[in-house]
């Protein structure tokens, strides 16, 4: 399984420097939508990393697909702080227990 990263240049640069090969630099919302659809169809991707704000800018249907996706597992970073709640909920959903309590 591979790690994929989607986002603007300033978000993906560090991942690219760390050696991640599946990096999709997307300057606008249509490019982000296209990259997300591509990654969702790619069975070799196990984890998708995106900026929380970019996920928030996606159409509702695509955002729902990301939230319900098991493979790839979507990790949202940065943004307004709601990303940690999202990660908490994903862990709770996967494990069945709230590990933060």
Swiss-Prot record:
Keywords: ATP synthesis, Cell membrane, Hydrogen ion transport, Ion transport, Membrane, Transport. It is found in: Cell membrane. One of its GO terms (cellular component) is plasma membrane. The keyword Chloroplast does not apply. The keyword Ion transport applies. Pfam families: ATP-synt_F. Optimum pH is 5.2 for ATP hydrolysis. It is a peripheral membrane protein. One of its GO terms (molecular function) is ATP binding. GO terms for biological process: proton motive force-driven plasma membrane ATP synthesis. Component of the A-type ATP synthase that produces ATP from ADP in the presence of a proton gradient across the membrane. This organism has both a Na(+)-translocating F1F0 ATP synthase and this H(+)-translocating A1A0 ATP synthase. Belongs to the V-ATPase F subunit family. Has multiple subunits, A(3), B(3), C, D, E, F, G, I and K(x); there may be a few other subunits as well. This is A-type ATP synthase subunit F. It comes from Methanosarcina mazei (strain ATCC BAA-159 / DSM 3647 / Goe1 / Go1 / JCM 11833 / OCM 88). The lineage of its organism: Archaea, Methanobacteriati, Methanobacteriota, Stenosarchaea group, Methanomicrobia. The gene is atpF.
